[in-house]
Amino acid sequence: MKQILVSIVIPTYNRADFIGKTIKSVLNQTYSNFEIIIVDDGSTDNTKEVVRSFADSRISYFKKQNEERAVARNYGTEKAKGDFITFLDSDDVFLDFHLAEAVSFIKAHISDLEIFFQPYYLLLEGQRKNKIPQKIIPIAKSLIKKGNFMACQGVFLKNEVARNNSFNEDRLLSGSEDYELWLRISRKFKIEYNPVYSSILIDHQGRSQHYRDTSLLILRKELFLKYTLAHGYSKPEFRVISSGAYSYIALHLALQSDNTAWSWLLKAIDCDLRILFTKRVFVTIKNLFLAKFTGIKGS
């Protein structure tokens, strides 16, 4: 059997302060047959110089106009030569055995493997946390019930699967484009699970999911539901997905002490009563009461 080539697509935008660490984490892999495809989505800082400081023939750098990360990931996919493709944001890192574990899993399931997921740690305030829900098999059902627990860095797709199932390039969907793809792709393929924690998602204030413009967040989630509706989910399944989207909006509004969070929370509960028993709803209600009775904003 030939040695498996893995393509790592790294979209980036003004991440000169982070991307060096990201690249090093890939170059430090114990498995060495990979290519790094860095797609610079119109950076105005010195990202290019940081990338060029790594003299490694496995690194390819492409700069294009700013069109958001879905377009950048799709661009990188078109350039990828690997048997399998994975994605890594330019402020996250692989542990040094990440690719070795993935390739071992590929070899063990090579006859029918199309897409699989390896879990990751969340680095929050300097501490590694396990944020992946328990009992996520089958993944397709868990994506409906538990929301998006699949960060791009843990997803490996067969080259032709990635090429034929691209990220939605609607710019206003940015931030939910990965979840929309996982739901769409799970309707076509079985998503396998390799339960080895092998990468780190680093939480920081610059991350794009830290929304301050709630109107854009609401629009994004409404677009997400519009696109997801077209994937052929049953009415009960779609109501569960909708409940997750509405509760997400409610949480972010509550964290800003915005009382309109209540209306979104009620919509979430109306779609799926079980959402009441989740940590997200508990935190939402706690922050709304804190703001009302103490004036303290949540965090």
Task: Indicate residue ranges for each PLM-predicted region.
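N-proximal low-complexity "stem/linker" segments adjacent to membrane-targeting elements
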Residues: 1-25
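Short, acidic, metal-binding catalytic loop of nucleotide-sugar glycosyltransferases
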Residues: 24-33
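A conserved acidic beta->alpha catalytic loop
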Residues: 25, 40-49, 66, 89
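Glycine-rich, basic loop-to-helix element that forms the pyrophosphate-binding segment
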Residues: 64-80
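Short aromatic/hydrophobic "clamp" motif used to bind/position activated sugar donors
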Residues: 85
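Conserved donor NDP-sugar-binding/catalytic core segment of glycosyltransferases
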Residues: 97-130
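Conserved nucleotide-sugar donor-binding catalytic segment
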Residues: 118, 134-215
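Catalytic core of nucleotide-sugar-dependent glycosyltransferases
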Residues: 142-144, 197, 201-205, 210-236, ...
